[in-house]
Design a protein with these regions (language model features):
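Positively charged n-region of N-terminal signal peptides that target proteins for export
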Residues: 1-6
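Bacterial N-terminal signal peptides
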Residues: 8-17
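Hydrophobic alpha-helical transmembrane segments
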Residues: 17, 235-240, 336-340
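Soluble non-transmembrane domains of integral membrane proteins
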Residues: 24-209
Length: 342
């Protein structure tokens, strides 16, 4: 039933475009300019956005003209508020916002051909979907979902015409360890306030692809994890428990490394994506935890063997583990790469 309803509405939209006299429908062109993208928090699943939205429409009394239209009025402040109270204008909402949209500035431009341009600069915190399986590497799809707020789709259509970065410079508007990778716009979407799709509103999505910087992920996650694994293996292989004095160094060192892993994971909590699947950062933390815990337990057991059974039994087992444990660590790291990148 829902699919049939969507098909009928799509047909209505097409008919209204071919025969505007059939349906009293207003087409509103939408342009979005990104001014600043900041505080991309994968753990909280939000990011902050400062953007400029331009909505353009024509009144029923307007007529097409080949000549360039001239600005009749340019309204701001109190005069703009009074005009909007007595004038119909398209009201839009951001469907994936996580906080209230705060407007910095409003401008209404009216031209002599009946064209109206409403420009709004605003700040908003937007929800994101942290779908980035290869984190701390890879791309993240951020988007702004813009939909009509009061007029249903048979009365108002949002038509995305332009999507750009301010001044065309990604380095100037992106804050944090991310870079701009591309953008796309999706129109002809429907937004429903109810589950039965009885009320449908026109919706556009403005997507911008962000790439996580390699150096940030390498120095914050990959390098510390590999160093902890390496130190854990070195403690095992070069602190033989055949010498009683090494017991404190080896067991205490493994315990310190284990606590370091937990502290690192906790400190990066807001930056790590919370996904329903195993991403690369999760896999690497699991690997380093398994290796350090395994080496800690092995150290305790081998030390106990030396104390109770002596060198005859403990030393051969320790020598075998000096070879097996590094191979085990390499196998776990390879598995982590395979599960996330292949």
């Amino acid at each position: 039933m829902k699919n049939i309803l969507r098909i009928l509405i799509s047909c209505a939209v097409l008919i209204s475009g071919l025969f505007p006299q059939v349906l009293a429908q207003t087409v509103v062109d939408s342009e979005l300019t990104l001014n600043e993208i900041s505080h991309i928090q994968l753990g909280d699943e939000t990011f902050d956005l400062n953007a400029t939205l331009l909505l353009e429409w024509k009144t029923e009394a307007s007529q097409d003209s080949d000549s360039e239209s001239k600005v009749v009025e340019r309204l701001t402040g109190k005069e703009l508020v009074e005009t909007l109270n007595n004038l119909w204008y398209p009201q839009v909402a951001i469907g994936n916002r996580a906080s209230k949209r705060e407007s910095e500035d409003y401008i209404l431009i009216i031209r002599d051909d009946g064209t109206h341009q409403l420009i709004e600069r605003f700040n908003v915190t937007i929800s994101l979907h942290p779908e980035i399986a290869t984190y701390p590497f890879g791309n993240l799809d951020l988007f702004v979902s813009l939909h009509a707020a009061h007029k249903e789709i048979d009365q108002l259509i949002l038509n995305p015409t332009k999507f750009e970065l301010r001044d065309g410079s990604a380095s100037e508007i992106i804050r944090g360890n991310w870079s701009f990778s591309g953008e796309r716009t999706i129109g002809n979407l429907f937004y429903s306030l109810t589950n039965d799709d009885t009320e449908l509103f026109s919706m556009n999505e403005f997507h911008f692809i962000m790439h996580h910087d390699f150096s940030d992920g390498f120095f914050k996650i990959i390098l510390p994890v590999f160093l902890i694994i390496l130190l854990s293996l070195l403690l095992n292989n070069f602190s033989s428990l055949a010498f009683a004095a090494n017991a404190d160094w080896r067991i205490g060192g493994q315990l310190t490394l284990l606590l370091t892993v937990l502290a690192l994971k906790f400190s990066l909590e807001s930056e790590l994506p919370q996904t329903h699947y195993l991403n690369f950062s999760d896999a690497m933390f699991i690997v380093v935890l398994v290796v350090t815990i395994f080496n800690l337990v092995v150290g305790i057991l081998i030390n106990n063997l030396y104390q109770k059974q002596g060198d005859v039994i403990a030393r051969p087992i320790e020598k075998i583990l000096e070879t097996v444990v590094p191979l085990f660590a390499v196998a776990l790291i390879s598995l982590a790469f395979y599960l996330t990148f292949i």
